């Protein structure tokens, strides 16, 4: 999910309008401050959003999953209401930021659920720190060879220009609400879900100063996730791969490839869903998550 960007100062909310009761906290890792939400009691589960995403993409998981699990939902470094330091946003940075976050939160071992880029961070984290992962749930995750697999027009255009001086940052900074709406519609099968409220929520997050740098740097380093790909066949954590049948970003064939590469995995394809089935078809997705985690 691509953010927009300009220069609004970062002011962290004390509550979200979509769930005012959700507890928000901060964690100070060495690169900056992360905002995260916590809910429920039970075994720990981390939920990781995708490229340019934010805590809100998990809004439909909070209530059902928190009945049985302790949820930790961070805004990744550089995203949402977390700090945007001017560093290089490499896969290694995101992986280490999750390790730091778990250390600070006192989480020795957890199940990880990741969507899109968050899925890639999850499987790469599991390869780097297998002793800290219980189970993996990958929802329309990025594959090891991410850039050639991208299908939606907005991302293909952005990744095509990502290495040109200043142009990607300018493109992000000039992103309008209309352009953002078009990008969000590429994330779902049912365009009616992209309401004015959803657009405005994402638009305001993306206006925070430093966003253009974060998005551009993340895109420029995206292919470095291939460094972890060779070990995917050794991933021994139980893994559930969930895929939207109508995903316009990564087609179902990408999910099938991941399923083949990760020997300990199973694949569930959700009909009538795009790139974010946990948001577009939450009931079916939540049932699958709870059944898998409960084994």
What label would you give each PLM region?
Residues 1-44, 67-69, 107-108, 293-295:
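Alpha/beta-hydrolase fold catalytic core
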Residues 35-81:
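Conserved HGGG/HGGXW glycine-rich cap/lid loop of the alpha/beta-hydrolase fold
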Residues 37-39, 72-117, 149, 287:
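Active-site loop/oxyanion-hole signature of alpha/beta-hydrolase fold enzymes
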Residues 147-150, 171-234:
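Conserved alpha/beta-hydrolase catalytic His-Asp/Glu region
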Residues 235, 241-243:
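Short beta-strand/loop motif that positions the catalytic acidic residue
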Residues 246-250:
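Acidic catalytic loop of the alpha/beta-hydrolase fold
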Residues 265-295:
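Catalytic active-site module of serine/aspartate enzymes centered on a nucleophile-bearing elbow/loop
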